[in-house]
């Protein structure tokens, strides 16, 4: 135990001094168990405080087009390859999207993300033009920071989003490259990375994260986090698998709450100065331990409902942040 304490403290001091940790050092941190996990989390919280202060970045998502997706992501209720009981509907019109954006601004979101099912867009589609109009109306009628989650895009499509005021693009890699083939077969990992690079070239912030609990190892979570560091993304949403009946992963074994908390902390050690965001699955998987996420290095949160599952009440989220004396 004492040796692991020393490992945590020495690696943590290295990060505090502005140095990057190695894959081997991250693996050393992952050996923390029992009370060592709380020291690991405490140091991750110290890193969050030093590099990011006490502000929590809040965002919300609009599921603007749901279901009937051509892709076969094993976790996703919206895939046409699955038999999940999920609401399916075509793209909402721009006025409906604006109405939903105003609702999210009213309940406290600072960023609003328009998300659509499907592989992505080239920039010429009628639906994509509707999305551009929706963003223009949001820019004119709200104070929200505009975000998009539209799948893989061409450079042309990405530049069109930037031109109407979209400031952040969300494109999750989902898992490590070494595990990806177990989760998706209909499009490749490099396609996703190309989209991230298009967003960076368009001078957008990039939000790219992961789902934990897909069957990956801790080593693969570390592999993924190190790649996100290399890609220099701005924000990392961490989803925890919430298995949906009818999907390939409906019977996946859930991670233990302490394994999840330890994962948050290690990601903070790897990405000390980034937004690391609570995303889907926290309510089901962590239950009463949700506040521990913010004591383990998190500094962002998706509030309200998710794409196909419900989140806890916004008031409960705000009360949690107030109790932790965090700003938002």
From Swiss-Prot:
<dbReference type="InterPro" id="IPR013785">
    <property type="entry name" value="Aldolase_TIM"/>
</dbReference>
<keyword id="KW-0004">4Fe-4S</keyword>
<keyword id="KW-0479">Metal-binding</keyword>
<dbReference type="InterPro" id="IPR007197">
    <property type="entry name" value="rSAM"/>
</dbReference>
<keyword id="KW-0408">Iron</keyword>
<dbReference type="GO" id="GO:0009102">
    <property type="term" value="P:biotin biosynthetic process"/>
</dbReference>
<feature type="binding site">
    <location>
        <position position="73"/>
    </location>
    <ligand>
        <name>[4Fe-4S] cluster</name>
    </ligand>
</feature>
<comment type="pathway">
    <text>Cofactor biosynthesis; biotin biosynthesis; biotin from 7,8-diaminononanoate: step 2/2.</text>
</comment>
<keyword id="KW-0808">Transferase</keyword>
<dbReference type="GO" id="GO:0051539">
    <property type="term" value="F:4 iron, 4 sulfur cluster binding"/>
</dbReference>
<feature type="domain" description="Radical SAM core">
    <location>
        <begin position="51"/>
        <end position="282"/>
    </location>
</feature>
<feature type="binding site">
    <location>
        <position position="147"/>
    </location>
    <ligand>
        <name>[2Fe-2S] cluster</name>
    </ligand>
</feature>
<feature type="binding site">
    <location>
        <position position="277"/>
    </location>
    <ligand>
        <name>[2Fe-2S] cluster</name>
    </ligand>
</feature>
<comment type="similarity">
    <text>Belongs to the radical SAM superfamily. Biotin synthase family.</text>
</comment>
<feature type="binding site">
    <location>
        <position position="112"/>
    </location>
    <ligand>
        <name>[2Fe-2S] cluster</name>
    </ligand>
</feature>
<dbReference type="InterPro" id="IPR002684">
    <property type="entry name" value="Biotin_synth/BioAB"/>
</dbReference>
<dbReference type="InterPro" id="IPR006638">
    <property type="entry name" value="Elp3/MiaA/NifB-like_rSAM"/>
</dbReference>
<feature type="binding site">
    <location>
        <position position="76"/>
    </location>
    <ligand>
        <name>[4Fe-4S] cluster</name>
    </ligand>
</feature>
<comment type="function">
    <text>Catalyzes the conversion of dethiobiotin (DTB) to biotin by the insertion of a sulfur atom into dethiobiotin via a radical-based mechanism.</text>
</comment>
<dbReference type="GO" id="GO:0051537">
    <property type="term" value="F:2 iron, 2 sulfur cluster binding"/>
</dbReference>
<dbReference type="GO" id="GO:0005506">
    <property type="term" value="F:iron ion binding"/>
</dbReference>
<feature type="binding site">
    <location>
        <position position="207"/>
    </location>
    <ligand>
        <name>[2Fe-2S] cluster</name>
    </ligand>
</feature>
<dbReference type="Pfam" id="PF04055">
    <property type="entry name" value="Radical_SAM"/>
</dbReference>
<comment type="subunit">
    <text>Homodimer.</text>
</comment>
<keyword id="KW-0411">Iron-sulfur</keyword>
<dbReference type="Pfam" id="PF06968">
    <property type="entry name" value="BATS"/>
</dbReference>
<dbReference type="InterPro" id="IPR024177">
    <property type="entry name" value="Biotin_synthase"/>
</dbReference>
<keyword id="KW-0949">S-adenosyl-L-methionine</keyword>
<keyword id="KW-0093">Biotin biosynthesis</keyword>
<dbReference type="GO" id="GO:0004076">
    <property type="term" value="F:biotin synthase activity"/>
</dbReference>
<dbReference type="InterPro" id="IPR010722">
    <property type="entry name" value="BATS_dom"/>
</dbReference>
<feature type="binding site">
    <location>
        <position position="69"/>
    </location>
    <ligand>
        <name>[4Fe-4S] cluster</name>
    </ligand>
</feature>
<keyword id="KW-0001">2Fe-2S</keyword>
<protein>
    <recommendedName>
        <fullName>Biotin synthase</fullName>
        <ecNumber>2.8.1.6</ecNumber>
    </recommendedName>
</protein>
């Amino acid at each position: 135990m004492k040796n692991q304490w020393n490992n945590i403290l020495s690696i943590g001091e290295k990060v505090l001094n502005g140095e990057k940790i190695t894959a081997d050092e991250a693996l050393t941190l992952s050996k923390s168990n029992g009370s060592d996990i709380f020291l690991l989390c405490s140091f991750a919280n110290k890193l969050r405080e030093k590099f990011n202060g006490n502000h929590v970045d809040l965002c919300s998502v609009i599921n603007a087009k749901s279901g009937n997706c051509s892709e076969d992501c094993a976790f996703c209720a919206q895939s046409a390859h699955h038999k999940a009981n999920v609401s399916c509907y075509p793209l909402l019109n721009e006025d409906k999207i604006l109405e939903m954006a105003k609702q999210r601004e009213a309940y406290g979101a600072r960023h609003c993300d328009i998300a659509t099912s499907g592989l992505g867009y080239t920039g010429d589609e009628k639906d994509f033009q509707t999305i551009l109009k929706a963003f223009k109306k949001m820019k004119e009628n709200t104070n929200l920071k505009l975000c998009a989650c539209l799948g893989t895009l061409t450079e042309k499509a990405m530049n069109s989003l930037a031109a109407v005021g979209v400031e952040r693009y969300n494109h999750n890699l989902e898992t490590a490259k070494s595990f990806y083939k177990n989760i998706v077969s209909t499009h490749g990992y490099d396609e996703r990375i190309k989209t991230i690079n298009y967003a960076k070239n368009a001078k957008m912030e990039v939000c790219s994260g992961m789902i934990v609990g897909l069957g990956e190892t801790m080593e693969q979570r570390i592999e993924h986090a190190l790649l996100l560091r290399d890609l220099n993304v701005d924000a990392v949403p961490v989803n925890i698998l919430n298995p949906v009946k009818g999907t390939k992963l409906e019977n996946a074994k859930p991670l233990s709450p302490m394994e999840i908390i330890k994962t948050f902390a290690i990601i903070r050690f790897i990405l000390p100065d980034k937004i690391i965001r609570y995303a889907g699955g926290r309510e089901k998987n962590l239950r009463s331990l949700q506040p521990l996420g913010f004591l383990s290095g998190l500094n962002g949160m998706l509030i309200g409902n998710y794409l196909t599952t419900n989140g806890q009440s916004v008031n409960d989220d705000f009360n949690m942040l107030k109790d932790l004396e965090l700003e938002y």
